Structures are given as C-alpha cells and as structure tokens.
C-alpha cells in the first residue's frame, strides 16, 4: 500500500492527510473505477506553533570534529525503485519517482511527505541533494528523521533563506531550534542544496553543502524512519526534487569530561 502525508491549510488551520511508516492509513486518492479506494487519514503532520524569535546564525566550514565516527555506507539510494518510497499522484499533491529523482509537488496551501520504507535509523549520517523548482517566501522543504508515525523531528529550509527544527510529538509541534538565516539556503527557485544530518544519541547536527550549521540536543526519539517533505505556505504551488541519498553508519562515543578537582 502506498503511503502519503498531505496537509491542507483551510480557513487558516491545517487539515492534513498523511500516511505513516508503521500501521499507517493512506489518504483517499481520486482513482479509476478499477482501482481500490483508500481510507482517509487524520494525522496532522504540520500542526500550528507559536512564532519564535529570529536569531542570526553564522555559517561555518565543516571540520572532521563536527561529524566524527562516520563508517561504512549502508544505503545508496539512486531513486530508481519507486517501491522504496511512499508515492502518490493526485490533483492536490504528488510524490513521484522518475529519472532517478523523487519529486514532491503541492498546490497552494498543501503539504506532502514521503518516507523511505524498510529502514529504521538510530546513529547515522545521511546526505541528500535537493533541487528547488517552484518555491517562494515562507514555502519550505526538508528532511524528516527518527519518525515513528505521529512523532518525529523535522529539519526545515524555507525559501526566504531561514532554517529551523521542529519536534512533533503525538501531532503536537514544538520549535526546538528557532529560525536562523543561512547563506547555504537557496533564496527561492531555482536552487540546489545538499542537506546532511549527523545523528548520534540525543544530538543531531545539520550540514548544508558540507558546511556545519548547528547542533540540536533532543532525546525524545532515539530512532525511526527517514523521509522528506515540502509545504506550500502561500497562494502558489511548490515543487522540489530529491536525489542521491547516502546513509552511513556512525560509531562515535562522546568523550567523558573529567571532573574538575
């Protein structure tokens, strides 16, 4: 069964239809009479949250110390097999794999997410390339990590040049790293960026184009699925494509601080 995460922003509040990696319910899709109609989901993957205070983030060059312990490559995904991702095609949103790319396209006010199937990650380093075709202002896209259904982390890149991180727990959203500007975020479309995430234990470090951005320490979800998403926040469509996913093992133990006598 294909699984899909779609949210509709109607009357100022998000109405979402989504699919989950475990025990999920797929959204109802317009289909020919020969296809089976799927039930409707009610999970809100894009719940509202308070507007955080903006702070400035300097972009720094990545060093070996910022992503230590990277070991063997465990996933090389060229997006040649559509069965490995949640895909769907409808009038409001689509997640399709073609020409070795996963394309997410949404109409105004709609969101969509797609998870990589059959993979649960705990300590890892992942890289994925994103190409932005249609995107403006507060529209956004990014990656989902450690997803267990209605709970996950979302690293968000906005088309106004900001990045931030949210934790969604049982459909309740909380900003755990406030929006900051970054010169590595494409200011709208067209654009391209490589997103990297180093996750060990309760710490997650974000990299853009190989450059370290910031670190988040959050121990609520120790493991889960990996995915991608996009969201239209305005009155225009959004289209982004994802390609070249690579995932590596990470074997790293943080050094123990010696107590001061």
Question: What feature does the model see in each segment?
Answer:
Residues 18-72, 76, 248-261:
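Ser/Thr-rich, Proline-interspersed low-complexity disordered segments
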Residues 73-92:
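Short, tryptophan-glycine- and acidic/Ser/Thr-enriched carbohydrate-recognition patches
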Residues 79, 126-128, 191-206:
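Short tryptophan-centered beta-strand motifs in secreted/extracellular beta-sheet-rich domains
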Residues 93-112:
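Short carbohydrate-recognition loop motifs
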Residues 107-169:
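Secretory/extracellular carbohydrate-interaction modules
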Residues 171-196:
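Short, aromatic/His-centered strand-loop micro-motif at the edge of beta-sheets
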Residues 216-241:
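Flexible glycan-contacting loops in extracellular carbohydrate-active proteins
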């Amino acid at each position: 069964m294909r699984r899909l995460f779609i949210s509709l922003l109607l009357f100022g509040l998000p109405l979402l239809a989504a699919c989950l990696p475990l025990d999920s319910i797929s959204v109802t899709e317009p289909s020919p009479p020969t296809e089976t109609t799927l039930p409707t989901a009610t999970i809100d993957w894009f719940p509202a949250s308070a507007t955080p205070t903006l702070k400035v983030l300097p972009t720094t060059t990545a060093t070996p110390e910022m992503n230590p312990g990277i070991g063997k490559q465990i996933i090389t995904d060229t997006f040649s097999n559509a069965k490995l991702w949640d895909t769907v095609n409808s009038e409001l949103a689509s997640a399709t794999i073609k020409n070795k790319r996963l394309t997410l396209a949404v109409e105004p006010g709609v969101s969509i997410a797609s998870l990589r199937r059959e993979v649960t990650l705990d300590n890892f380093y992942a890289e994925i390339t994103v190409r932005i075709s249609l995107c403006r202002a507060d529209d956004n896209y990014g990656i989902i990590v450690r997803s267990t259904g209605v709970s996950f982390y979302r690293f968000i890149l906005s088309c106004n040049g900001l990045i931030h991180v949210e934790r969604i727990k049982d459909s309740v959203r909380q900003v755990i790293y406030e929006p900051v500007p970054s010169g590595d975020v494409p200011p709208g479309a067209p654009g391209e960026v490589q997103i990297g995430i180093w996750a060990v234990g309760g710490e997650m470090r974000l990299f853009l184009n190989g450059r370290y951005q910031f670190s988040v320490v959050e121990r609520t979800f120790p493991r889960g699925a990996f995915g991608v998403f996009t969201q239209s926040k305005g009155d225009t469509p959004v289209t982004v494509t994802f390609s070249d996913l690579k995932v590596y093992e990470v074997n790293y133990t943080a050094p123990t601080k010696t107590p001061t006598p």
